[in-house]
Amino acid sequence: MAYVDGFLLPVPKKKLPAYLRMARKAGRIWREHGALEYRECVGDDLDVKMVLPFPRLAKAKRGEAVVFSWVLYKSRADRDRVVAKVMKDPRLAKMPKEMPFDMKRMAYGGFKVQVTA
């Protein structure tokens, strides 16, 4: 069963270019170690009225973009294997120590894929 790691985070718009540079590097590392997909999406159509909008869920402040990201794996076991390799990759240690966003406001979780259409 396919598995997804999902992320939702607010990123200051002035730091968005730095975040995306970091994400491109991270995406290459994850893909090289076996992730099937690595996606970083910046909010565009987020002014919704009928449901809880992502900016409110992410507690985005004025001047922040909302980023929705996911990484797709073959299975939970494959995800565990890939992430273990990624964490040992020396390129990850070269990433900036200071993140271009507030880590305390990032949401994360692992999900079993139930429907693929």
Task: Please annotate each region the language model reported.
Residues 4-11, 50-86:
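Short, well-ordered beta-strand segments in beta-rich or mixed alpha/beta enzyme
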Residues 31, 35-62, 88-117:
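Glycine-rich beta-strand-turn "strand-cap" elements at beta-sheet edges
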Residues 13-15, 77, 114:
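Residues that cap or initiate secondary-structure elements
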Residues 20-26, 82-90:
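Short amphipathic alpha-helices in soluble, non-transmembrane regions
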Residues 1-25:
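Long, hydrophobic N-terminal alpha-helical segment
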Residues 18-31, 66-71:
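Generic detector of contiguous secondary-structure segments
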